């Protein structure tokens, strides 16, 4: 079982969120020069989540067999931060002033055990579920006022940040009690 306090976990969450926001800021100029259509944005995010899920599965398997390389860990963290950065960019487009604070606040409220170890199938299932929730509200008929999508982007952001934290801590499986 982890010896991290909730205060340490929150500080780690904030630091990782800042790293993702740095990635978002680095890509901001390109996004302004080449805006994406909504369908392309969702397709790109789907590909990023897919890469993250595949990477997590591979890393968890390699960790269980004792052949996990630092490169693989770095790739999983990179994929997780890309997903979070993509979601933060979408949130910033909707709320340029408060996007980061709202993600941070919701992250603190919903950390629970999401940044710790869990079975790979659960971790991957959660990522796919949050992506599916986001995709479902991406049409005007489901969310005509655009009020649901920000919550879905924040949920996927938080999950991706928690995946990056778990990868950084080497928590590929459910922790032993």
Segments the model singles out, each with a brief description of its role:
Residues 1-177:
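Flexible "arm" and connector segments at domain edges
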């Amino acid at each position: 079982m982890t010896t991290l306090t909730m205060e340490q976990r929150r500080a780690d969450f904030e630091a990782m969120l800042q790293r993702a926001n740095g990635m978002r800021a680095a890509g901001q100029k390109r996004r302004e020069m080449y805006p994406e259509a909504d369908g392309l944005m969702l397709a790109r995010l789907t590909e990023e989540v897919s890469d993250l899920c595949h990477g997590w599965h591979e890393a968890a398997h390699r960790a269980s067999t004792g052949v996990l390389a630092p490169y693989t860990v770095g790739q999983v963290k990179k994929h997780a931060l890309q997903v979070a950065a993509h979601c933060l960019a979408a949130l910033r487009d909707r709320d340029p002033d408060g996007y980061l604070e709202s993600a941070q606040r919701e992250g603190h409220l919903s950390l629970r055990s999401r940044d710790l170890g869990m079975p790979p199938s659960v971790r991957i299932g959660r990522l796919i579920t949050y992506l599916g929730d986001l995709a479902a509200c991406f049409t005007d008929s489901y969310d005509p006022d655009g009020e649901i999508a920000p919550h879905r982007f924040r949920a996927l952001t938080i999950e991706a940040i928690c995946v990056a934290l778990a990868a950084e801590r080497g928590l590929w499986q459910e922790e032993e009690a």
